[in-house]
Amino acid sequence: MAKKNVEETVECFKMSEKLKKDMIKKYGQIFRSGSDIIEENKNRIYIPISPAHDSNTGGGIKEGSFLGLSGMPGTGKTTTALQLIRNAQRPEFGSRKTFYGDIESRLDQRNIDGVSGLDGSQEMMTVFRPTEQAINAEDSLTVIEDTIRQNEKMIIVIDSVSTLISKSELEDEISGQNRSLLPKILKNFIRRNAIPVQAKGHIVVCIMHQMADMSMSRKTKTMDGGNGIQFQCDNILEIKYVTPWLDSENKRIGQFCNWEIIKSSGAGLTGAQYESALRYGYGIDDIHEIIGAAMELGIITKGGSWYKADFLPETGKEGKRQVQGQDKVASFLRDNPKIVDDIKVKLQEILLC
């Protein structure tokens, strides 16, 4: 009796294997072991944004994922996306090319020049933008979908999701009566392209404005684009507020963007808040941020106004490796870019270990 049960089990297993082969023939290699999935995820490359972002998101943004950048207009979302693009262009991250969906038609040379080291040439960065009239959301997303499916390992930016307008809204008379179809269109786009984005190793950046929600009894702000796109995004980073960055003469040289991790599917801690330093005409100030990140992870220690680290020059008779004041640390690092690169590597190793 036991032998018969074993034979039936073996026969059932054979049938399952035949069914599996038939399904693979029809749909492709859709069966993998759990260890294969783990190994595949382990080999994914993380693209850094900046030290402050990376130390809070678990090392940067993983290829094959969706990133949502949210906040009020003019708070630094586009600059942050361009910073990610600049880093992705570096050889150690695959010299990745960019498709920039400039739906708002606001990207200009000032934005490109405002991120130090960004290559805005057509070879590295293709910009899709309406010229004479608005292009409906369906057509815009079709162009982006074709780009996703026909290329590999690109940074693809939608700037912004909030500006997309459905075909019916674009062609009908202007009125406030019709409920926006955009969330449904975006949800469909996301569903169709979630797997191709992962398979092709892209990073899709969805820039979303905070919009006033007047349907509640009190004024609230909400991310535009609907729940579908928020559900799909692996990471959602939101700028809660900005504060001025003033120099010693009280002149504004930039702004501090105060971020919150709204969602993280990686090592980032949902709800974590941190500050990113955006310097006008330069982009995110890596030196300013790297000092903060290195202090958080113990690479730099501080006692009073003295900053101590193995890489700092020896001072005094005792030969202590320390300098007084953050400005002196920053000045030393700017004069020693090789040390900055070494610190970045060390930070990545700690964050991704």
Language-model features: locations:
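Charged, alpha-helix-enriched surfaces in structured cytosolic catalytic cores
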Residues: 14, 18, 48, 64, ...
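Conserved inter-motif catalytic segment of the P-loop NTP-binding fold
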Residues: 2-3, 83, 88, 92-179, ...
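Terminal-proximal interaction/regulatory segments of ATP-powered molecular machines
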Residues: 308-309, 315-353
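Peripheral, non-AAA+ core regions of ATP-driven protein-machinery
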Residues: 2, 24, 28, 32, ...
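Long, well-ordered amphipathic alpha-helical subdomains in the mid-to-C-terminal portions
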Residues: 286-324
